[in-house]
A protein has these predicted regions:
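Elongated alpha-helical scaffolds
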Residues: 79, 83, 110-139, 357
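Short, glycine-/Ser/Thr-/acidic-enriched flexible segments
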Residues: 136, 219, 230, 364-365
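Hydrophobic residues embedded in beta-strands of well-ordered beta-sheets
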Residues: 88, 138, 148-149, 180-181, ...
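Short loop/turn segments that connect beta-strands within the blades of beta-propeller domains
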Residues: 84-86, 125, 132-135, 207-210, ...
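Residue-level detector of short, conserved catalytic/binding motifs and their immediate flanks
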Residues: 66, 79, 86, 127-128, ...
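Small/polar beta-strand repeat architecture
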Residues: 5-21, 97, 101-120, 156-176, ...
Length: 406
């Protein structure tokens, strides 16, 4: 009986599992092979031998594990990073990047020990590469020139945060800006009821609409934090009031004919037509010269009493055409703690998705994906706008950590 041999014309199916031996009923059976070693498969089906390698340089410590990571800015500027025990070195164009006289290898110190290398994951945008590890803060590698490289912690703006507080525990800030002391009424709701710990240092905290980074822990209910730029720990006004109907007059305070209901704005730039919460203060400020010598009364509302401040019948001059209302620093139960910390873990996966820097796979939220503000990779300000940061938790019958993002 004649023997028929099939002509294999392409190998786009790659190596086939031994479990597919004899499965000639599958289309891919005729596009694969049992073993394809040291070959490169072309998109159009053919295969050629892989290119050879050559010795460029010895790694820093040959006895320890080393990991090679590509860093490609474009098709003409491509590097290889040699990650080793607490360092990385750089290679380009078949050689090691060096500097100085005599020349020495450019080396950057890292916090990644040999045991950490296998768990590192990377996402690159132009000259910046983000590096994640489940037990370490997110860092970024930046290239500023051929021989100038840095690796620094990522300074996230306004998040991401855990779910908002739902307990009766309140936080009170001792000041509005700069370095502030924040005191909790109880440990309930903070790190599972254990309160603040030293693992919270470097963690973000959101108090109402202010944001700060924890710099020290005094006790389980007391921390020191630095308010982030352009943020203040002000209590936002609500459009309600407890005093009798209040009007705002602009012009000569002695002339009642000028009284009307002009609106004012609170510290969050929200318009408030009239009324306050308890114990709110009005602060007048201005710059330049007033064309009509406009005057404003500075008043304080306490429950149902309208008082002039600092004393009766005091009129303060101001060239400002707006009034800023700043709430008193009071205990507030509207707070949240940062999602990335030694206490909660750090993301183990990273990628870019639709102009957003995306993280996933923390120890406390293994199935949650964190998306940055669109086009602003290190900004995680949540909101309702189309470009606001997003936090999304996958729903499934098993809770398994997200291992990979693409």
């Amino acid at each position: 009986m004649a023997r028929a041999n099939f002509a294999f014309t392409n190998f786009t199916a790659g190596e086939l599992s031994p479990r597919l031996n004899g499965r000639s009923d599958l289309a891919k059976y005729f596009n694969g092979c049992e073993t394809l070693e040291n070959f490169l498969i072309h998109p159009h089906g053919g295969a050629t031998r892989r290119p050879g390698t050559r010795f460029v340089a010895e790694v820093k410590t040959s006895s320890l594990q080393t990991r090679l990571v590509p860093f490609q800015f474009n098709v003409t500027q491509a590097y290889v990073l040699e990650f080793g025990n607490n360092y990385f070195r750089i290679y380009k164009d078949g050689g090691q990047v060096t500097s100085g006289s005599p020349a020495s290898a450019v080396e950057v110190t890292t916090t990644y020990a040999t045991a950490d290398l296998a768990a590192l994951k990377f996402a690159q945008s132009a000259d910046v590469m983000y590096v994640v590890h489940p037990d370490k803060p997110v860092r970024k590698i930046a290239r500023t020139s051929h021989t100038a490289w840095t690796i620094t912690d990522v300074d996230f703006a306004r998040g991401p945060f855990l779910d908002p507080n739902t307990t009766a525990t309140t936080l009170t800030s001792g000041a509005r800006t700069g370095s502030v002391t924040i005191t909790a009424s109880a440990a309930t709701g903070i790190n599972g009821g254990s309160g603040f710990t030293t693992d919270d240092i470097g963690r973000l905290v959101k108090l109402h609409h202010g944001y700060a980074e924890i710099t020290a822990v005094g006790s389980t209910t007391s921390i020191t934090a630095t308010v982030q730029d352009n943020d203040v720990f002000d209590t936002e006004l609500e459009p309600s009031y407890t005093a009798s109907t209040i009007s705002f007059a602009e012009g000569d305070p002695s002339s009642t004919s000028l009284e009307h209901n002009d609106r004012i704005i609170d510290s969050a730039k929200n318009w408030v037509k009239q009324g306050f919460l308890d114990n709110m203060e009005i602060t007048v400020s201005g710059a330049g010269t007033s064309a009509n010598n406009t005057s404003y009364l500075i008043v304080k509302v306490t429950d149902d009493t309208l008082l002039l401040a600092p004393s009766d019948d005091v009129v303060n001059e101001s060239a400002s055409s707006s009034i800023t209302v700043v709430g008193k620093l009071v205990a507030d139960d509207e707070w949240a703690l940062g999602a990335f910390s030694p206490e909660t873990g750090y993301p183990s996966s990273v990628t870019f998705y639709e102009q957003r820097l995306t993280f996933a796979g923390t120890a406390s939220q293994p199935q949650t994906v964190f998306f940055s503000v669109s086009g602003d990779f290190e900004n995680f300000t949540a909101g309702t706008e189309d470009d606001s940061a997003l936090i999304y938790t996958l729903g499934s019958n098993q809770v398994n950590v997200i291992r990979y993002l693409s």
